[in-house]
Amino acid sequence: MSVLTFLKPRGSSSVARERLQLILAHERAERSETGRPDLIITLREEILNVIAKHVTVERDKVQIKLERGEGVSTLGVDIEFPVDAISKAKPKAKRAIA
């Protein structure tokens, strides 16, 4: 970039493009924040269904949290198992080795 280009006033198209990019980024961030509860509810139900195959767990004892950071998302799952549920867990069928 030369000095003349640097000092030249920017055109309206580049200013409009930057404004549009800011608006789109804001809308995407807003949509992803409001869309997360649906994802968390779906994940919670699927996780509960998988766990129910092995152990009986009260649905209100499962907490799921989704955190988004820069370039990475973290899914946290906290499940409170009753002591007797672990001892009564359905045993996994063993495969015969041929």
Swiss-Prot record:
Disulfide bonds: none annotated. It comes from Methylorubrum populi (strain ATCC BAA-705 / NCIMB 13946 / BJ001) (Methylobacterium populi). This is Cell division topological specificity factor. Prevents the cell division inhibition by proteins MinC and MinD at internal division sites while permitting inhibition at polar sites. This ensures cell division at the proper site by restricting the formation of a division septum at the midpoint of the long axis of the cell. It holds the Pfam family MinE. GO terms for biological process: cell division; regulation of division septum assembly. Keywords: Cell cycle, Cell division. Gene3D superfamilies: Cell division topological specificity factor MinE (3.30.1070.10). InterPro entries: MinE, MinE_sf. Transmembrane segments: none annotated. Belongs to the MinE family. The keyword Cell wall biogenesis/degradation does not apply. The gene is minE. NCBIfam families: minE, PRK00296.1. The keyword Cell inner membrane does not apply.
